[in-house]
Amino acid sequence: MLTTTLLTLTLASLSQLTIYTAEDAIRDKDGLNAATQYMDAICVNIRPECRSELAPIVAAIRYAENGGKGKEYGILHPKVKPTYRSQAGWCAATVQKNYDRWVKAGKKGDFISFLGAKYAPIGADNDPKGLNRHWVKNVKTYSKKFVW
């Protein structure tokens, strides 16, 4: 009886847990063409041995930023073209570069908090409403839902 109850509880819990591949999450949000561009950005900018950890973070950033056309990943650098692929590519490259910096610094703290300090710093001039204060929490929440 106890085993049946635990199994029922476990199955009930699993039915509430939705996990997507990062590619599926992007396809569901932005369409098939965007998912293809996302995958290209990942393959070009994130090393193969890092993809399982970093690709879901890139997808989580897309969901957390929720930017409109040409700013989907929240990249505001003047050299970024206002295209989905450019946004995804710059985001992926930024994630990889900051991951490398975090590792070199001794992996102090968690990576998403480290990344957030660079990607969406609290008090930034381009954040007059203070929304960056939610960035780390949002990216962590979404990244737990996505796998490579």
Predicted regions and their residues:
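Non-catalytic cell-wall polysaccharide-engagement segments
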Residues: 2-50, 78-148
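Short amphipathic alpha-helical segments, especially helix-boundary/capping motifs
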Residues: 34-35, 67-71
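Short, functionally critical alpha-helical segments immediately adjacent to catalytic or ligand/cofactor-binding
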Residues: 50-69
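Acidic/histidine-rich, surface-exposed loop or edge segments in extracytoplasmic proteins
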Residues: 71-77
